[in-house]
């Protein structure tokens, strides 16, 4: 045999030998798996059964999770020992008032055992809406509601209307939105009042869709400290979808990617109604009058104790072996320091990190100027004081340390005559004075340097509002950029100047803008620093 033939023979033998070894190993592996399978299947499963027992077992916080409406419609039995308990609620916004209402309705706690501690002289928190004789009508913002606000509707079906005897707030709200459903006829404009014809399209590329899906599927932990611009590129940012989304929810490119994901998860069921707001529902009046006042009356009728001009500065905790117990509340009542001693029979509810804390108000002739960082920041200071006691209480500085990136500005404009009405009607295709849906949500001026958006809800937005007046809510996403008509940043503008910029984007002739605003509208500009 030649050397070449010998090499081939040796190689063939080696391959055959290797193949036999692999086959032998494979057979052993399969035999092992079969034995394991036999062992597993032959063992009786006496310790396992299909059941839902224990599904409603309470967790370490004393609560359990459920779904459906079975438990929502049942009236709870009176909790044992509730007559010996008291509750202290810090703040009187929607969250605190809702907690108090549930304590009365479901917890069956005595009203005079519930104490609401509010730094201001009025309840409502961010759900505001008021007439200030020195400024005019003021709304800092508004809530966009939909049919899956289960907790809200559960609450308000129990809150009596303050307008219509014998019905609930939910009844009124439901009937109104059935008779006058919400939808927009013009979602965006360009070229000073022309319909941008977004026409319900998202204009997302396949790559843009995949970026959104990837964010949706990413673990929360992997999004900590990431911004939206870390996870999206121009495939998303140049889409009409991003125009809809960022203007509806006030998102900047540098905002939290995790917050963006959570918004996706919360509202994905209404993605089809995003372009024309047909998924949304609105109250008859501003949300202070439509939601807060009925809740406040319900609580007052139950004997709940409202303590206004009471600023809570700290909650002192005793921490032992991982157990945290609130022992005292430190507060200032009309500027005088006071302490409230707590026992384990006292419940404490704290609204921390309010986005409307430190609001700065302007008016027709003054910009909302002021250094928010050196102002008393109320519930942010409270959260910082609590967080110093234990790391598990969170990191408030993550949310309130860079107001250049968290500030946001809105304005309330009240028309004084008919001159601007035709321009409004031309855009939204509805007369704003009918008392019915007007814009159906925000109209975004997509080529505005401030990225200005504005909306007119059903008029009048205030019970005291004259029928000849229209209240408009306006906001700008970019507050530090000079405007198109007003050549200065929105944050430095008076209410009059914001109104001028708004009318400019309606197509009012430039030489008429200033005169029309002087005679035809009043604007109140509002800087909100922690959005």
Segments predicted by a language model, with ranges:
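C-terminal segments that line or cap access tunnels to active or ligand-binding sites in enzymes
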Residues: 268-283, 345-347, 352-531
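Rossmann-like flavin
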Residues: 162-266, 281
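Glycine-rich FAD pyrophosphate-binding loop
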Residues: 104-131
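Glycine-rich Rossmann-fold phosphate-binding loop(s) that bind the pyrophosphate
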Residues: 91-94
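Conserved FAD-binding subdomain of flavin-dependent enzymes
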Residues: 134-175
């Amino acid at each position: 045999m030649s050397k070449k033939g010998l090499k081939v023979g040796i190689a063939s033998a080696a391959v055959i030998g290797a193949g036999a070894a692999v086959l032998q190993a494979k057979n052993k592996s399969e035999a092992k798996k079969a034995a394991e399978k036999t062992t597993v299947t032959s063992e009786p499963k006496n310790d396992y059964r299909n059941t839902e027992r224990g599904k409603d077992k309470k967790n370490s916080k004393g609560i359990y999770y459920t779904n459906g409406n079975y438990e929502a419609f049942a009236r709870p039995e009176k909790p044992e020992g509730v007559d010996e308990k008291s509750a202290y609620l810090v703040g009187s916004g929607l969250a605190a008032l809702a907690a108090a209402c549930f304590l009365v309705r479901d917890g069956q706690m005595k009203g005079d055992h519930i104490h609401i501690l509010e730094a201001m002289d009025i309840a409502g928190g961010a759900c505001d809406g008021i007439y200030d004789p020195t400024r005019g009508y003021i709304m800092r913002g508004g809530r966009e509601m939909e049919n899956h606000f289960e907790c809200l509707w559960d609450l308000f079906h129990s809150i009596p209307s303050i307008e219509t005897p014998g019905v609930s707030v939910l009844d009124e709200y439901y009937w109104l939105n059935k008779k006058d459903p919400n939808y927009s006829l013009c979602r965006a404009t360009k070229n000073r009042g022309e319909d941008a014809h977004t026409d319900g399209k998202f204009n997302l590329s396949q790559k843009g869709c995949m970026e959104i899906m990837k964010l949706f599927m990413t673990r929360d932990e992997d999004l900590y400290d990431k911004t939206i611009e870390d996870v999206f590129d121009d495939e998303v940012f140049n889409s009409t979808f991003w125009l809809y989304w960022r203007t509806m929810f006030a998102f900047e490119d540098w905002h939290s990617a995790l917050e963006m994901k959570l918004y996706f998860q919360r509202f994905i069921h209404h993605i089809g109604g995003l372009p024309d707001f047909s998924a949304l529902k609105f109250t008859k009046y501003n949300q202070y009058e439509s939601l807060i006042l009925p809740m406040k009356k319900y609580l007052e009728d139950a004997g709940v104790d409202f303590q206004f001009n009471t600023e809570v500065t700290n909650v002192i905790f005793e921490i032992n072996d991982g157990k945290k117990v609130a022992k005292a509340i430190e507060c200032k009542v009309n500027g005088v320091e006071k302490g409230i001693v707590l026992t384990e029979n006292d419940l404490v509810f704290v609204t921390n990190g309010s986005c409307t804390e430190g609001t700065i108000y302007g008016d027709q002739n003054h910009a909302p100027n002021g250094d928010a960082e050196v102002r008393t920041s109320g519930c942010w200071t409270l959260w910082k004081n609590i967080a110093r006691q234990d790391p598990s209480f969170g990191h408030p500085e993550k949310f309130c340390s860079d107001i250049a990136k968290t500030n946001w500005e809105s304005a309330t404009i009240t028309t004084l005559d008919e001159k601007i009405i035709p321009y409004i009607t031309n855009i939204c295709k509805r007369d704003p004075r009918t008392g019915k849906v007007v814009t159906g949500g925000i109209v975004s001026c997509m080529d505005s340097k401030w990225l200005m958006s504005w909306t007119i809800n059903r008029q009048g937005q205030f019970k005291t509002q004259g029928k000849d007046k229209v209240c408009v809510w306006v906001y700008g996403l970019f507050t530090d950029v000079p405007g198109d008509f007003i050549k200065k940043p929105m944050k430095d503008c008076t209410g009059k100047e914001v109104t001028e910029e708004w009318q400019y984007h309606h197509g009012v002739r430039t030489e008429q803008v200033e005169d029309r605003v002087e005679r035809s509208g009043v604007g109140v500009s509002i800087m909100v620093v922690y959005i």
